[in-house]
A protein has these predicted regions:
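Long, compositionally biased intrinsically disordered regions
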Residues: 100-104, 409-521
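Secondary-structure boundary elements
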Residues: 168-344, 355
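Hydrophobic/aromatic-rich core segments of domains that either
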Residues: 335-342, 347, 352-438
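Bacterial N-terminal signal peptides
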Residues: 11-21
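Extracytoplasmic
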Residues: 485-638
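Intrinsically disordered, low-complexity N-terminal segments that are enriched in acidic
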Residues: 29-252
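Bacterial Sec-dependent signal peptides at the C-terminal "C-region" and cleavage site
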Residues: 20-30
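Bacterial N-terminal signal peptides that target proteins for export
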Residues: 2-12
Length: 638
């Protein structure tokens, strides 16, 4: 096989597809091609010459596989890719078919065919991988390979369009093309969105000018991931009333926002361990920066247990389960002055809005996440230290991530976790790029060429050696429902004497911690006690489950009228509490302010207390929305 015949023509016609990195976030409409000036034409010729020289050098340097052996490998790869697609299609068909028996029979046949294809591929794949092992495990050719990938994905024309803008832009590209380590970081992280490497380099440079901290460790990786992802601007989703707000996210400000949050200890502890590739899917959201800050503050105040849970599958994103009502009937009440995500937790939504909110709250705390649509339903996937997990959807195999089979995305993420070995996969992909192959995301895509097949079989070997564990989907049964059918175990919470101490000041003011209940004395499905970011503990009264009263028993030294106010956090308007003081026959209505996730106090109401023992009994009229309570203040009425 003559591997160089079609190289140059392919390169000059179009950029190689850049797979899972492109079209991740909402992008503006692509601008028309920029005409090249005379200087731009010379630059294009210069970059094309660089690319051609690298293609020739790499084609010569790549190890050769004997023709018959290569043909056998390709035949096995093509058969497995076709069988994988057929198996997936048969699985999906069973869900749609009216003739379930026939569909099940076809599904079983497809699985048998896939098993045969897998078995038939083992020998040719192992033989080829063994021969190519010295190349795959060596970084000797990396500098040339990564430079070629940058030139190929950006295209000489695209680079020239950027460089012709001025000496500064041309110098930035020269600096990038001379920095093998930086180019390698970029292409290992799946390259610049839209192949816009010049724009990515500009953003990265601007970030480093704006912050001296964006040069080391996680902050350098986050700066680079942000630069790559925002090379094609991300459309910003503003409050409807904010007609003067920027239309796209400012990537430098986005970086600085996360830098500040990280240094303040506001992000997830796992953030510091993210790769450049992971970081792309943290800072790529459509929300304004102030909305990210709101997301963190809201959850700290309103539902801190979602931050504190050890279960990474549900950390942060459990807010969808507990507080984003399923149904679109209230969306007419969205407020133009509120941000999109503030409206979602207030008025709810069907699968799309719930998945949007889930991804938003994960990004707010620095957790990588992506959309994962499946037929007729919107779900999400997100990072955990143990691997990526699906929320609110069916198991792996039923959806797509960035337009590719979710199982292909899963395999790629599992291989990426083996950081030392994963470059072996990439070297094979880079070799394929050098020889004009289209990148294949996985076996769920059509076979594209010899080297991409090598990459996929190497990836599989890495996954098997690592004994990677696939995390099961969670929240499948609440994807289109309000309450789970799974029985929830409510964990017992220890409330210390200090946390439930009722304090009477010298001025007669009494402060009752929300967790100082005489009934209930432990968390229930409706009433949860949890640690508070204000110190001590707080209560959350859930929107789900049956109504449940709660009481406080305390002593008062002087009888009389007292002004009662409650410190609350709400994410929906029109919240109310009803309080019975001692033996009162009728409750007093307490209106809770719409705090949009902040702490605030209710307008005071008067209650009559007796000297000695008193009981305040609170209840709510269902249906209700969630309500966080920190404490109650009773002030003597003069």
């Amino acid at each position: 096989m003559n591997q160089r015949n079609t190289i140059i023509t392919v390169r000059l016609l179009a950029a190689i597809a850049i797979g899972l990195s492109s079209a991740i976030a909402a992008k503006p409409e692509q601008a028309a091609a920029v005409p090249l000036t005379e200087a731009g034409q010379k630059l294009e010729a210069k970059y094309a010459a660089m690319l051609k020289a690298l293609e020739e050098e790499i084609a010569t340097a790549l190890p050769k596989i004997e023709g018959a052996q290569q043909a056998a490998f390709l035949k096995a790869y093509e058969a497995e890719a076709a069988a994988t697609t057929a198996d997936r299609n048969a699985m999906h068909a069973q869900n749609k078919s009216k003739d379930k028996a026939e569909a099940a029979k076809a599904g079983a046949s497809a699985k048998e065919a896939l098993a045969r294809a897998l078995a038939n591929a083992q020998a040719p794949a192992q033989a080829v991988l063994a021969q190519l092992n010295p190349f795959l495990t060596s970084d000797k050719l990396d500098a040339q390979l990564v430079k070629l990938v940058v030139l190929a994905e950006a295209t000489p024309r695209g680079l020239a369009e950027f460089a012709q803008q001025g000496k500064e832009q041309e110098a930035l590209l020269e600096k990038l093309l001379a920095d093998a380590d930086l180019m390698k970081q970029m292409v290992v992280a799946a390259g610049a969105s839209g192949g816009k490497y010049g724009q990515a380099m500009q953003i990265f440079t601007d970030i480093q000018k704006a912050s001296s901290r964006g040069k080391d460790d996680i902050l350098q990786r986050f700066a680079l991931g942000t630069s790559l992802e925002h090379a094609v601007p991300v459309v910003q989703r503003n409050a409807v009333a904010r007609t003067d707000a920027p239309t796209t996210v400012d990537p430098v400000k986005r970086y600085l926002h996360y830098e500040k949050a990280y240094l303040a200890g506001e992000l997830d502890p796992g953030f510091k361990d993210l790769s450049v590739w992971d970081c792309r899917f943290v800072g790529n959201g459509d929300e304004p920066d102030e909305m990210l800050a709101w997301g963190r503050e809201m959850l700290r105040n309103y539902h801190p247990d979602h931050i504190q849970t050890a279960d990474y599958r549900w950390r942060y994103v459990e807010a969808v389960k507990t507080d984003v009502k399923y149904g679109s009937q209230d969306q007419k009440n969205d407020l133009p002055t509120l941000g999109f995500y503030q409206n979602i937790i207030n008025t709810g939504g069907v699968c799309g809005r719930r998945a949007f909110f889930g991804r938003f709250i994960l990004r707010s705390f620095g957790i990588p996440t992506l959309a994962r649509p499946q037929p007729g339903h919107a779900t999400l996937v997100h990072w955990t230290p143990a691997g990526w997990v699906i929320n609110l959807g069916a198991s792996w195999g039923w959806g797509t991530v960035v337009g590719e089979a979710d199982t292909d995305f899963l395999a790629m993420t599992q291989a990426r976790m083996a950081e030392a070995a994963y470059p072996e996969v990439l070297r094979a992909q880079w070799a394929g790029t050098a020889l004009g192959e289209k990148k294949a995301a996985g076996f769920g895509a059509a076979a594209t060429g010899f080297w991409n097949g090598v990459a996929l079989y190497r990836q599989r070997a890495i996954i098997e050696k690592a004994k990677a564990v696939t995390l099961a989907a969670v929240g499948t049964d609440i994807g289109e429902a309000n309450e789970s059918k799974e029985k929830e175990v409510v964990k017992s919470v220890t409330v210390s004497e200090a946390d439930k101490k009722i304090v009477a000041g010298p001025d007669g003011v009494i402060t009752i911690p929300a967790v100082a209940c005489s009934k209930p004395t432990d968390s229930t499905p409706k009433i949860r006690f949890m640690k508070s970011y204000l110190g001590g503990m707080q209560m959350h009264y859930s929107r789900m489950g049956n109504a449940e009263p709660f009481e406080y028993t305390f002593d008062v030294s002087a009888a009389g009228k007292y002004s009662l106010s409650v410190r609350v956090a709400t994410v929906s308007p029109d919240q109310r509490l009803l309080v019975f003081a001692n033996e009162a026959k009728e409750p007093i209505d307490i209106a809770a302010p719409y705090t949009i996730g902040k702490w605030d106090k209710t307008p005071p109401v008067e209650v009559a207390l007796v000297k000695g023992k008193n009981v305040l009994r609170f209840t709510r009229n269902e249906p209700v929305k969630g309500l966080a309570i920190k404490d109650f203040t009773l002030t003597p009425v003069k």
